């Protein structure tokens, strides 16, 4: 699917109502996909004013990476098969399809504007973090230790030698860039710990145990859209979580630790991390 394939007839078909005219605008900075905001003109009030389309990147290398990691397949299948079984806020999916033979895909999603994407470099407020961990509980809680998830073969799992080998390759690819960027900001002890981890990936992956749930796999501020509070007077923003290219079946604590460790500035994390974990646990408790 490319922008040239988007026509009024195609949009009318997938949205279930006549589209008389449309406009397109490239949005976001996706590395392995392309995002378009499509403005719609229709005589049918059931047709939204705009939608967001996700489709493959025009870059062949990005397409190959996405195919190897099953990103396109997993994102489409998350929206079609998993999204309705969990409570986390996601854009409504009007249409989704993925073609196994070509790895082509398209998603037609609710346009969440004027919600604003988070910034993992700038960090977030405490209220933003509270809303994010509650949304995480809404992802994990509904299918906590659900045995039927073992039958969902397209969910990412870091188990088995093949998965461990993939993790090792990714480590070798990305660690040099990490070291070049952050070495000067880390103590010798911290950097040594990070450097040594590469030799112990297999042990780390093999020893993880405990409850399992649906996981996001990349739960960071850049993948969250922040909007007005759901309830009037609430300090907590409405959060919509996007970029479901890495959904998995694994330890839910990984999503939580990744967000708390990377979402807040260090001084804020040190002060509030325990209360955020406690709030997450409270959110989980509502699911039994």
Predicted regions and their residues:
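Juxta-kinase regulatory segment immediately upstream of eukaryotic protein kinase catalytic domains
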Residues: 1-24
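Short amphipathic beta-strand and strand-loop transition segments with alternating hydrophobic
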Residues: 21-27, 94-96, 196, 202-203
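Active-site acidic catalytic loop and adjacent metal/ATP-binding pocket
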Residues: 27-42, 52, 198-252
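Conserved ATP-binding subdomain of kinase catalytic cores across diverse folds
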Residues: 28, 32-41, 45-167, 252-253, ...
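Active-site activation/catalytic loop segments of kinase-like enzymes and analogous catalytic loops
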Residues: 77, 246-288
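Generic, well-ordered alpha-helical scaffold segments in large soluble proteins
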Residues: 82, 139-142, 200, 218, ...
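ATP-dependent phospho-/nucleotidyl transfer catalytic cores
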Residues: 115-216, 226-237
């Amino acid at each position: 699917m490319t922008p040239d394939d988007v026509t009024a007839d195609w949009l009318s078909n997938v949205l279930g109502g006549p589209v008389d005219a449309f406009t397109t605008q490239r949005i976001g900075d996706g590395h392995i996909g392309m995002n378009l905001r499509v403005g719609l003109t229709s005589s049918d009030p059931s047709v939204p004013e705009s939608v967001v389309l996700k489709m493959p990147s025009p870059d062949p290398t990005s397409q190959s990476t996405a195919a190897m990691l099953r990103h396109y397949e997993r994102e489409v299948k998350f929206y079609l098969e998993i999204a309705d079984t969990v409570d986390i806020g996601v854009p409504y999916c009007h249409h989704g399809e993925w073609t196994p033979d070509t790895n082509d895909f398209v998603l037609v999603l609710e346009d969440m504007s004027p919600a604003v994407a988070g910034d993992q470099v700038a960090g977030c407020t405490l209220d933003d973090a509270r809303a994010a961990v509650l949304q995480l509980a809404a992802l994990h809680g509904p299918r906590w230790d659900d045995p039927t998830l073992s039958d969902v073969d397209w969910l990412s799992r870091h188990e088995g030698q093949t998965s461990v080998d993939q993790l090792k390759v990714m480590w070798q690819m990305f660690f040099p860039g990490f070291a070049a960027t952050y070495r000067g900001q880390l103590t010798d002890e911290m950097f040594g710990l990070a450097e040594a981890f590469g030799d112990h990936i297999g042990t780390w992956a093999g020893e993880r145990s405990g409850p399992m749930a649906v996981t996001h796999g990349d739960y960071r501020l850049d993948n969250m859209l922040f909007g007005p509070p759901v309830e009037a007077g609430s300090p907590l923003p409405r959060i919509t979580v996007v970029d479901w290219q890495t959904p998995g079946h694994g330890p839910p604590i990984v999503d939580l630790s990744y967000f708390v460790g990377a979402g807040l500035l260090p001084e804020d994390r040190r002060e509030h991390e325990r209360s955020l974990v406690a709030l997450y646990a409270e959110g989980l408790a509502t699911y039994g």
